[in-house]
From Swiss-Prot:
The gene is zraR. Phosphorylated by ZraS. GO terms for molecular function: ATP binding; ATP hydrolysis activity; sequence-specific DNA binding. Its main location: cytoplasm. One of its GO terms (cellular component) is cytoplasm. It is found in: Cytoplasm. It comes from the Bacteria. Part of the Zra signaling pathway, an envelope stress response (ESR) system composed of the periplasmic accessory protein ZraP, the histidine kinase ZraS and the transcriptional regulator ZraR. The ZraPSR system contributes to antibiotic resistance and is important for membrane integrity in the presence of membrane-targeting biocides. ZraR is a member of the two-component regulatory system ZraS/ZraR. When activated by ZraS, acts in conjunction with sigma-54 to regulate the expression of zraP in the presence of high Zn(2+) or Pb(2+) concentrations. It comes from Salmonella typhi. Pfam families: HTH_8 (PF02954), Response_reg (PF00072), Sigma54_activat (PF00158). This is Transcriptional regulatory protein ZraR. Residues 141-370 form the Sigma-54 factor interaction domain. One of its GO terms (biological process) is regulation of DNA-templated transcription. Residues 7-121 form the Response regulatory domain.
Length: 441
């Protein structure tokens, strides 16, 4: 690493100490940013990629250990050095356990500081943990679960290549976020990232969007238009819901991928294009191939590198971090002083199955913030389907029959709606007839 290209974030609520460190580190050739609180540090880490964080332990609002853990959740690869005026073994051990690379005793020995900085940055290079050109947190990819770490590792491995990527996952799992992270971490990051949802357009419109059209090619084509392939030339083209395209479009897309050239609608001229293609789908394309609905040759072209998106229920340990992330965003947007969640509300969020995944969680938190009149989000502000989630003791050896679980949810919904069966059924997403049938079992 060239020092002039290394960005260091100093986190300390002592303004004078921050200023001294900034002058010192800049004198050594580093770029330095300052944060006077843990919350300020997190905001900066979300917006910018830092090569190293130097963080004080004792801070008023959010201490250094808590800040360290939150930063690691946002970007596990970033090296963090802890500063403490208290040379207790307990503090050092706690910091190292939380993910700190090393710790420094205040007042700082500047020679020791310089040596520790150089070792930390060298360690980053040696372990191959050179930070990508953009932090995962910038794209909303938040979490420290094994599933999330596996996904981030896949992104780091795949991004340097030009191999076509197929991202598979349920709706709301963040497939476009992964595509954006792949592009940002690739050698094409300074070139365009062009996105298109294939399911949102009919066949003729999709053809025009992908390949462009000549003036007069069809009714309404009053001028020549370049397609998404040409717009993405030199960069990345992300095609979402690729499993929804028609057989004719499958043929045209296959040709574009194989030949690396496209033709505008209404033209015989071919245009060479250089794009990194990333596709995504919620469908099982192997199953679609077996059923004759998707071309096998196109499937093999797309599925060079496969990335499987974990559902939110497969990484429940990330829910508190995600919920807090959305809470801060919507609290700021709505100008509300929200402090957090009640323990009961967080339990409900963790135990709910999230069929709509991260998108559903985001919507639920936005709704809760809008409805909130106090300082903490409780079960009252959560959507009924979540508030009615039964929470069983984790150590319970007995598996409760599904019919009993359904009845518990329905009874909770009825209690919340004052016994109104029609409203309870509506909020649970079932018909009144189904609700009555399940109650009578």
């Amino acid at each position: 690493m060239i020092r002039g290209k290394i960005d260091i974030l100093v986190v300390d609520d002592d303004v004078s100490h921050c200023t001294i460190l900034q002058a010192l580190l800049r004198g050594w050739g580093y770029n330095v940013a300052l944060a006077y609180s843990g919350h300020d540090a997190l905001a900066q880490v979300r917006e910018k990629v830092f090569d190293l964080v130097l963080c004080d332990v004792r801070m008023a609002e959010m201490d250094g250990i808590a800040t360290l853990k939150e930063i690691k959740a946002l970007n596990p690869a970033i090296p963090i050095l802890i500063m403490t005026a208290f040379s207790s073994v307990e503090t050092a051990v706690e910091a190292l356990k939380a993910g700190a690379l090393d710790y420094l005793i205040k007042p700082l020995d500047f020679d020791r500081l310089q040596e520790t900085l150089e070792k930390a940055l060298a360690h980053t290079r040696e372990t191959g943990a050179e930070l990508p050109s953009a932090s995962a947190a910038q794209f909303g990819m938040i979490g420290s679960s094994p599933a999330m770490q596996h996904l981030l590792n896949e992104i780091a491995m795949v991004a340097p290549s030009d191999a076509t990527v197929l991202i598979h996952g349920d709706s709301g799992t963040g497939k476009e976020l992964v595509a954006r992270a792949l592009h940002a971490c690739s050698a094409r990051s300074d070139k365009p990232l062009v996105t298109l949802n294939c399911a949102a357009l009919n066949e003729s419109l999709l053809e025009s969007e992908l390949f462009g059209h000549e003036k007069g090619a069809f009714t309404g084509a009053d001028k020549r238009r370049e397609g998404r392939f040409v717009e993405a030339d030199g960069g990345t083209l992300f095609l979402d819901e690729i499993g929804d395209i028609s057989p004719l479009m499958q043929v045209r897309l296959l040709r574009a991928i194989q030949e690396r050239e496209v033709q505008r609608v209404g033209s015989n001229q071919t245009i060479s294009v250089d794009v990194w293609l990333i596709a995504a789908t919620h469908r099982d394309l192997a199953e679609e191939v077996s059923a004759g609905r998707f071309r096998q040759d196109l499937y093999y072209r797309l599925n060079v590198v496969a990335i499987e998106m974990p559902s939110l229920r497969q990484r429940r340990e990330d829910i508190p971090l995600l919920a807090d992330h959305f809470l801060r965003r919507f609290a700021e947007r709505n100008r509300k002083a929200v402090k957090g969640f009640t323990p009961q509300a967080m339990d409900l969020l963790i135990h709910y199955d999230w069929p709509g995944n991260i998108r559903e969680l985001e919507n639920a938190i936005e709704r809760a913030v809008v409805l909130l009149t106090g300082e903490y989000i409780s079960e009252r502000e959560l959507p009924l389907a979540i508030a009615a989630t039964p929470i069983k003791a984790e150590n319970s050896a007995e598996i409760q029959p599904l019919v009993d679980v359904e009845k518990e949810v329905i009874l909770a919904a009825l209690e919340k709606t004052g016994g109104n069966k029609t409203e309870a059924a509506r909020q649970l997403g079932i018909t009144r007839k189904t609700l009555l049938a399940k109650l009578s079992r």
